[in-house]
Amino acid sequence: MPSHDKQMGGLLLLCGLTLSAATPTYHVLGDEPGAWPKILSSIGLQPIAGGPAGVVVVRRGSPQTAASWRSRIDQGLILVLEGESDLAQSFGFKPGAKRIAVSSLKDVRAPKLSIVWEQALEMPVYELPPQARVFTAERWEGAPLVAGYKQGKGAVLWVAVNPGTEGYERFPYLLHALNDLGMAVPFRSSKLWAFFDSSYRLRVDVDYFAKRWRESGVAALQVAAWHFYDGDAEQIEYLKRLISACHKESILVYAWLELPHVSEGFWRAHPEWREKTAVLDDAQLDWRKLVNLTNRAAFTEASKGVRTLIESFDWDGVNLAELYFESLEGMANPARFTPMNDDIRAEFKRLQGVDPLTLFVSPAPPEKVRAFLDYRASLARRQQGEWLDVLESIRRKKPYLDLAITQIDDRFDTRVHDLLGADASLTLPLLEQHDFTYLIEDPATIWNLGPKRYPEIAAKYKPLTPRQSKLAIDINVVERYQDVYPTKQQTGTELFQLVSVAARAFPRVALYFEKSILSPDLPLLASAAAAVTKIEQNGAITVIDSPSGVGIPWTGAALLDGHTWPVRDSGTLWIPAGRHSVEPGGADPAMRIEQFNGVVKSAVWTGRAIELTYESTARVFCRLSKAATALEIDGETIAAGLGVQIVLPRGQHVVSLR
C-alpha cells in the first residue's frame, strides 16, 4: 500500500473488487501524494490502492499511454493532471513560451472573491485543448490555471501547479471543478446547526431558504432572538413565517440569546441598568449593548421579557450564547473591559476589600487582580446557572424545548479565562443538573489555524465531563483578521476540511453563520459534514461504520442488515450510527420516512407499519412519503388520520406508524 494509504488506514478499509457509484474512490499515482488525500477525503472520497478508482491523480508522469487513459476516461474515470508533463501535453495542456508571475486568481464560481497566494509563482502560460473549460485563471492576464473537460462517461481536470501543502493554499475550488465534471460524492449528513440573523435576510423567500438549508445538511437554525424581544407586528409575522418554513422542512428553530445584550428597546428604556466598562462608559461594544444582569431588578425585568419571547413563538429550543464578559483584550483595554457596574464593584469590595476599578491603576496588587479575574469567571458561571433555571421553568410549560449553551473555548487558548471570564471547567458541571448541548466556540485568536485544532480541542474537554455526547463545536466562517491565504474567509477546500475534521472530533458541528457560507460551498457542505470511519465493499453489499449516522446516494428498495429499510428520501438512504450492511433488494415499503431530525436507533417495515425506535434532545419532525393513518407512541394510540408530517416528543421512544 502506498504511503498515503497507510496514513489513511486508521480511517477506513476498502475491500472487494467491485466498487459501486455510492462509494466513489480515488488513487494518487506514486509515493508522494502531496495534499490530494486531504482534498479528496474532505468530502468523503475513499482512497484505494488497487482496483478501479473513480478519480486518479497523476502528479508527474505515468507509465501508461495516453490512449489507455482515454479508454478508462470513456468508461467513467476522472483523471487529474498536475502541472507540466508529457501526459498533460498529450491531452492538450501545453506550456507556451510566455511566462508570467501568478499571485492573484479569479474563479468562475466567485469572480469577485479575492484569491491571493502568499508567494507569487512564475509559470508558463498554457495552451488548452479546444473543448476545455477554464475554472480558475490568473486575474489580470487571464492565463488558465485550472481547466477541464468531459469525455465519454468521465472527465479530465488539469491544474497548472500543485495545490499546496494543505490542499487549499492555491485553488480553493478544486472540488467544485471536479463536481462540475461529474464526480459523485459518497455521503451526506443532515446534522449541521447554523446560526441565523434576520437583519441579513429581511426580504428573502423563507420557504426557498428553508429548502436550501435542508439540502445543505442543516438540521437546526439558531435564530437571533433579540430582534424579536420587543419586535413590531412586521417582525413578529416574519418570525412566524420563518419558523413555519423551517418546520415544513423538518428543521428545528432555536431562540439564540446573546445576554447580557437583551434588546435595543431594553437598552433605550433602561439606561439605569446599562453595564459599565472600566472607564465607566456605557458598555456599548461592537453591536452588543450590555446590561447589568447582576442587578436584581434588571434580571427580573429581562427574564420576564425572555419568558414572553420564548412562550410567544413556536421555538424548538433555546441557545444561551456567550454569557460572559468583554473583551478579547482583557484588562489591557479598560475601555472595553466589563463588568464594572456599581453592583459588581460593591460585591467584590465586600469579598476582597478593594474596589476593582482601582486595579486598573498601576501598580495593582497581583493577588487582587487574580482574585478579580477568577471572581469574574465565577460570576459568568453564576449567571449561566440563573438563566438555565429560568429556561427550565419555561420548559415545564413547553417540555419539548431543547437547551444549548454556546461558550468560547478556553482550553486551547487558555488566555480566554482572563480575557472574557469564560471557564469550561465551571460551566460543564451544570450538565449534572441540566440537560443541554455545550457548544464550544472557536476563539478568534485561532481562526488562522488549520483543521487539526479540532481533535486537539476535543481532547482537552474529555477530562472535564463524562457527557462527551453533549459536546459540539462552532466553526466561525468569517473574514479573519490574521494574514491568511488564499482567502480571508474560509471557503472551498479549506471550509470542507474544517467541517470534515470537526465532524469526526465532535458529535455535532455548528456554523456561524448561514449568511457567511458562500453559495458555491452549499452543494458540498453536507458531504463534508458526513463522518464515516470505515467502509467495506463486497459485491452488492456495502458495510458502513459511522459514528453519527450518514446518508448515501440511493434509489429503490434497500436492505439494511438484511431487513427492509424504510428511512429513505428520493435520492438518499439514511443509515443510523454504528456498523451496518446495505444492499439493494426487498419490496419497497408502502410508506417511508423521508425526513427525521432525531436519532434513529432502529426502523423496520413490517408490511403494514413502520416500527421505529429513536431518541432526541428536542421534539422531532418526521416527514413521511405518504400520510399516516395511525400513530402509537410507547404502546399508546395517539392519533389517527394524520398527514405526511408528524411531530414526535423529545426523549427516547418507540413509535408505530401505519
Name what the model sees in each region:
Residues 43-48, 203-229, 312-313, 429-439, ...:
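Catalytic domains of carbohydrate-active enzymes, especially glycoside hydrolases
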Residues 200, 252-313, 356-373:
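Active-site-adjacent "subsite" loops/lids of carbohydrate-active enzymes
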Residues 24, 38, 42, 77, ...:
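A glycine-centered loop/beta-turn motif at secondary-structure junctions
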Residues 431-531, 536:
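Substrate-binding cleft of secreted/luminal carbohydrate-active enzymes
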Residues 23-93, 211:
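Helical hinge/lid and interdomain linker segments adjacent to catalytic or ligand-binding clefts
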Residues 84-147, 151:
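An acidic, glycine-rich "communication" segment
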Residues 327-328, 384-455, 484-488, 498-501:
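Substrate-binding cleft/loops of secretory-pathway carbohydrate-active enzymes
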